[in-house]
């Protein structure tokens, strides 16, 4: 069973790497040029655009139905998880789920892969989207927590443009680099 899983993950990794091509930006180049990796699939972009306001409201602590999320927002790490989890939930609510509704532990196409190769493009698209969404969540959380004014009211104002910039980098305003860390005394 382990061999099958390892082979499956190697296959997925090879397919994603092959699809990315030679012109992919390395993480070092992206950090040096202040470039955030973008996901250009219209299939998921429309849902991300719709879900971003809900996600920022939930994760900034302004959602009265989700007060338990406020305790997780003490660090960029907790905020990053909230952004990713809330986006996944919102996508599932809009039938753009990244998970199989019958199996909450696997990706949508993962369970059908061994029997059929016809789902490979959807699987590659889903794996790419999840990877970019995790990166966007992490970058947005880190950027918004390093902002000088990190009050709860300002957090939602920071998260919305940051998530939008991650999905639509060419049409949104470029984010300035985060401020330098305070000097050590």
UniProtKB/Swiss-Prot annotation:
Cell compartment(s), UniProt: Symbiosome, Peribacteroid membrane; Symbiosome, Peribacteroid space
Q: What is its main location?
A: membrane
Cysteines paired by S-S bonds: none
Superkingdom of this entry's organism?
Eukaryota
GO annotations under biological process? Answer: nodulation
The record, for InterPro entries, names: Nodulin
Describe how expression is induced or repressed: During nodulation in legume roots after Rhizobium infection.
The signal peptide, as residue positions, is: 1-17
Which Gene Ontology CC terms are recorded? peribacteroid fluid; peribacteroid membrane
- Sorted alphabetically, which keywords does the UniProt record give? Membrane, Nodulation, Signal
The answer to keyword Nuclease applying to this record is no
As for family, the record states: Belongs to the nodulin 20 family.
Write the protein's name. Answer: Nodulin-20
Q: Which organism is it from?
A: Glycine max
